[in-house]
């Protein structure tokens, strides 16, 4: 029987792309407990306001809320606990060098399944100023208007 491809996006941090410039994105595994995986597969995860930080050469995700699994009575853990990211040592060293720069943060962009395992798309991000956000919204509005006019023009 052939392996099935299940690269299903489970959660996305849309606010991250609005609040930050994403310089680079990388895939990382995440250490979870069984009931957390079941809860994530049910879509009961929230990436809003979560971030990653580095402690003693290891990378952890903070403020990622995974709701307790309904049938997982004593095996449920704290919904906001720190969760370790699984990366190669060379990747961690490179990220340490990048994060030491001023104004750079590690932000989880999305959570997805890859071959039955939960993976995190981790972004190396720089914060946007308010005028950058306005410029982005203005560009989107102009593009939307141009597309609308092209559609009207090509309709007949």
UniProtKB/Swiss-Prot annotation:
Pfam families: SmpB (PF01668). Its main location: cytoplasm. It is found in: Cytoplasm. The keyword Cytoplasm applies. Gene3D superfamilies: 2.40.280.10. It comes from the Bacteria. PROSITE patterns: SSRP (PS01317). Keywords: Cytoplasm, RNA-binding. Coiled coil: none annotated. GO terms for cellular component: cytosol. One of its GO terms (biological process) is trans-translation. Belongs to the SmpB family. Required for rescue of stalled ribosomes mediated by trans-translation. Binds to transfer-messenger RNA (tmRNA), required for stable association of tmRNA with ribosomes. tmRNA and SmpB together mimic tRNA shape, replacing the anticodon stem-loop with SmpB. tmRNA is encoded by the ssrA gene; the 2 termini fold to resemble tRNA(Ala) and it encodes a 'tag peptide', a short internal open reading frame. During trans-translation Ala-aminoacylated tmRNA acts like a tRNA, entering the A-site of stalled ribosomes, displacing the stalled mRNA. NCBIfam families: PRK05422.1, smpB. This is SsrA-binding protein. It comes from Clostridium perfringens (strain 13 / Type A). The lineage of its organism: Bacteria, Bacillati, Bacillota, Clostridia, Eubacteriales.
């Amino acid at each position: 029987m052939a392996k099935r491809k299940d690269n299903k996006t489970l959660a996305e941090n849309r606010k991250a792309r609005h609040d930050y410039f994403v310089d680079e994105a990388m895939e990382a595994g995440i250490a979870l407990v069984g009931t957390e995986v079941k809860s994530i597969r049910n879509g009961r995860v929230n990436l809003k306001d979560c971030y990653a930080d580095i402690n003693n050469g290891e990378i952890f995700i903070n403020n990622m809320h995974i709701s307790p699994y309904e049938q997982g009575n004593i095996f449920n853990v704290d919904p906001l606990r720190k969760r370790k990211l699984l990366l190669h040592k060379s990747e961690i060293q490179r990220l340490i060098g990048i994060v030491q720069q001023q104004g750079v943060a590690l932000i989880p962009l999305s959570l997805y399944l890859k071959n039955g395992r939960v993976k995190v798309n981790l972004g190396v991000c720089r914060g946007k100023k308010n005028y950058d956000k306005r410029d982005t919204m203005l560009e989107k509005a102009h593009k939307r208007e141009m597309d609308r006019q092209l559609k009207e023009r090509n309709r007949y």
